[in-house]
Amino acid sequence: MIISELQSDGRGQYGRRWISEKGNLFVSLFYVKNNLYLTLKQLTNINSFLVKKLLARYYKKKINFKKPNDLLIKKKKICGILQETIDKLDKKYLIVGIGINLIKSPNINNYPTTNLYDLIKKKISKKKVEMDLKQIFENKFKSLINKKK
């Protein structure tokens, strides 16, 4: 798991520019894809489910998934998830990039955004969210991909 404080050259789906605000959470998870026998769509569903599970620890109301890769609260984007595969040295890797708006809402044209702080009126330790995300993915990802086979 790689964590970034700030992204200066991030990108979103279809190569769009990814806007990142300092104080929010930006994480990349890496998996050897040779060991994963799921479609990208199945992996998208699993990763969205796990991030939604994380957010539900802090926000107790409805969280929606908007295809292909966003999580919304009150019709506003709180999280984006980008997945891609790369080939290196005869191995395929899955990279899952996750951006969660913890304390700031990026300004995206014609796309309302929100952040966890504005929703719950309480600052949450970014370190705690990082550790919770790591714990959820370590404990649940493997069991979920094995169920899908």
Which residue stretches match the model-derived regions?
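Short, histidine-centered active-site or binding-site loop motifs used for metal coordination
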Residues: 6, 31-33, 120
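Long, positively charged amphipathic alpha-helical accessory segments at protein N-termini or as interdomain linkers
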Residues: 35-36, 41-63, 73-149
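DPxDG-like acidic metal-binding loop motif
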Residues: 13-35, 43-44
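Gly/Ser/Thr-rich helix-start
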Residues: 11-16, 24, 81, 98-100
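Flexible, acidic active-site loops/lids enriched in D/E/S/T/G that coordinate Mg2+ and/or position polar
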Residues: 1-9, 13, 17
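General beta-strand structural signal in soluble alpha/beta enzymes
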Residues: 4, 63-67
